[in-house]
Each structure stands twice: as structure tokens, then as C-alpha cells.
């Protein structure tokens, strides 16, 4: 109480019956018991209540509050003017009313915690029966009851929303934990799965409002799943390292074998061997990228060395066969110009051409058949031209010559087969067969002569 404020005595005892008027006693009166004073808030214009309507002051200074429940003493005013007492206890009522109004506004605007507002309203309602104020306390009680009831509804709605939010947040973490467990159990795309687990953790950190015990259990699920994934991934790459080590050793052996074959001149067999080595290379799998690339360069260098040499040898052989074919073309041109009217001269010239033909050597398979066909046509032409006037000794000599040529080609075929030159052996056998047929034809002609 300030020096400028009249002293008053407030009582918080039970209100007496109106007929029992207290008698003043000499000496100081006890002051009011301490009660919580409503907090003052800066508010707009609020019409003050009329304390005269809800109270009275006895001649001895006793201040009475009048309410629906009756009258009760709220204090004693000994400082002079009763109007000052009405003003004092009226201001205290207005302060309490203002506090209740602010509570109501916070509740209506949603700026206050409904649970705290409800508790505050209940606490203030409990102080009304002993509040040292003059005013319409019944109206305040009704307002506090209304605030309490509405706060309870709002708090229930808030609680429902919180529970819904908690359920939704819990469901999100449940889904993330389940996804992490699925990745831990089945994922094989390790980088993608690892990135996703990190993204799950980032999202996890943004989810709040989950019950602590539930949150701890869900976190344990996620953490266990992440550990399981990391172990699986570690095991996978450890096994991959072991496999790559085995692949590396296998491919090193293939490289060594390829390098051994790179200088071979057995073109056919070595080509087949290189094809097998390449198939083995593809079946061996892959080592780590840098190792695999280095081994492949080594293998391919050996392979290229062999095939470059083979291609050069093949080109040289093909050039030789073309030259032989050109030489035999020239002999054929000479043979096809022979004058068969002088069959003795024609036969002699043809024998010389045949000897040169054999000395030239082989030609490519594509041209051999055509060249042989043309030569046999010339031989047939010369033979038929001379058959009319052959003598027996001449015919026998011719048949013997054919047999000798057949035996010569048979001998060449045997030598080629023994050396593994299959193609050359086949060609020699074909020539031997042709000459054998001519020898047999010549022998048949002798037997048919008169």
C-alpha cells in the first residue's frame, strides 16, 4: 500500500448472515489475508463496473460484497471517505475482470495454450469466494465457467490433433523403418540403396512428435537395418574382391599363353587356339576395372602380333598364288593356240607346256578348277586330233605317259597328306584321278583298234 492510498482491511473469512451486524472494537483491525492479485494487462478501454450495485460499507468501515449467494465481508475501510473504498475495491474487481477478459481473448484467438487457460480459469474460479473485490462476481464466475468449458473443448480438439499428428508421424517413421529393413534384406544395387538409407535418415530427422518409447523402438529398427545392410554390402565386396583376384590369376595365365603363341607360324592351329583363348577370356569374368583393362591390353597385343604376322603371310601367299595363276593363264593361251593338224608337234608342245605347268606350282582354289578344265580341254583336242593315225606303239606310249602322270600326282598327294597339308593333298588326288581316267581311256582305245 502506498502512502497516497487509504489504508483498508480486507477479510477473506466466511460471509456472515446479514442480520449479524459486527460491533466495532477498539484497537487495530487485522488486515486481509494475502490473496493472489490478478495480473494487470494493458488493454483498451474497458468500462469500469459500478461497485455500489454489488456492495455496501457500514458506518464502522466494514466492506460487504453482495452476490447471489448472499453477503460477505471483503474488508474494512478506516481511511475516510467511503467512496474511496468503493473505488479501491471496484478497481480490484476491474483488474480481475480484465485478466479474465484477456484469457477469453487468448482462447478465442488461439494464441494461448487451452490447457493452461483452463487451469488458470479453474484457479481463478476457486479464488472468487474469497476475492476482496466489489463487483458482479457471479458474472465473473459464469465467464470463468464458460472459459473453462470452451478451453476443455479446445484442449480436447488440440489433443486429438496432436494424437492424429503423432499417429501420422509415427506412421511415417514406421514406413521408413520398414523400407530400411527391406533394403537391408534384399537390396543388391549397393550405391542406390546406400544413398536411399542416407536419405531416409535425413527425412527421419525432420519427423517430430512421436512418443519417446515408440520413437526409440523405431530408431532401433532403422539402426539395425542400416547395420545389416552395411554388413551385407561389406561381405559382398569382400567376396567380389576374392572373385576378382581369381579372375586376375586366370587372365594372367591366358595372357602368358597368348604371348607364347604370338610368334607361332602354324597359322591354322594357332588361330583356332586363339579363338579358344578368347572364349576362355570372356567366360573368366571381370577383375577390377584398371586390372582388367591392363590385362586385356596385354592379351590383345599378343593376339594382334600373331594375326598381323598371319595376315602378312596370307597376303604373301595370295600374291604368289595370283602370280602362279597368271603364269598358267599365259601357258593356257599358248596351249590354246597349238596347231593340231601336226599332231606330233602339238603333242610335243603340249608335253612341254604340261611340264612348265607342274613347275609353276599351286594357284588359289577359286581359279584352280577353271584353269585345269581349260588345260584338259586342250589335251583332249590334241588327243582327238591324233587318234586317227596313231600307231600302236605311239598309243601305248601315250597311255603309259598318262599312267606315269597319275602316279606322279598320287605320290604328291601322299607327301602332302603326310605333312598335314590337307588341301594340297586333295588337289593332288583330284589330278591323279583325272590322269588315271585318261590313261584308262587311252588303254580302252588300244583295245578297240582293229
UniProtKB/Swiss-Prot annotation:
Biased amino acid composition, Low complexity: 431-450
InterPro entries noted in UniProt: DUF349
Chain segments annotated as transmembrane: none
Keywords: Coiled coil
Coiled coil: 163-192
Compositional bias annotation for Basic and acidic residues: 1-10, 395-414, 421-430
Highest taxon listed in the record's lineage: Bacteria
Entry annotated with the keyword Coiled coil: yes
Region described as Disordered: spans on this chain: 1-56, 387-450
Bias-annotated ranges (Pro residues): 19-39
Other facts noted in the record for this chain: Binds pyrazinoic acid (POA), the active form of the first-line anti-tuberculosis prodrug pyrazinamide (PZA).
Protein name, as recorded: Uncharacterized protein MRA_2757
Organism per entry: Mycobacterium tuberculosis (strain ATCC 25177 / H37Ra)
